[in-house]
Amino acid sequence: MTKDFFTKGSVCFLSLNMGYGGAEKVIATLSNEFARSGREVTIVTFFEQNDFTHVLDSRIKLHNLSIQNFKMSFFSLSKFIYRHRFDNFVANIWPLTIFSFLVRLIWPKTKLIYVEHCILSEQYKDKNFTFRALQALSIAIFYRFAHHIVSVSNGVQDDLIDYGTPKKKMS
């Protein structure tokens, strides 16, 4: 991962919500550490649930896009990204990662980091062929927009490589 991500600029984390979960706990922990080090931190969510309010540093900005229709989230996120310029943008978990390519289109200098927590081929193995084909295509196309892709295990990394994710962007 680029050294600048750990030391410079504002950071925005994208999550569906901040309900209790592993990815959300990682977001809360990293956000608190970045805020304590003096960085400007924003967490943007699609839905309102926030079970981490009591543990988040008061300097962290929370923004809820209040999505009523998931199909409209593309436009809500585009508008948010356009209005707020971040130095670093971190998207956790497919399908949020595929929406985040917008960052590179709107603000090309923003460092885009994807974090994948699951073996997607296993998580969605019971979905129909069309879903799995579209998922594979979306990963092969949109994961190339990321500056860096963090996989939480070797199994997750191998799965993403099987989908066509560039190995040189991964850790």
Feature names for model-found ranges:
Residues 1-171:
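Membrane-interface segments of envelope glycosyltransferases acting on lipid-linked substrates or membrane lipids
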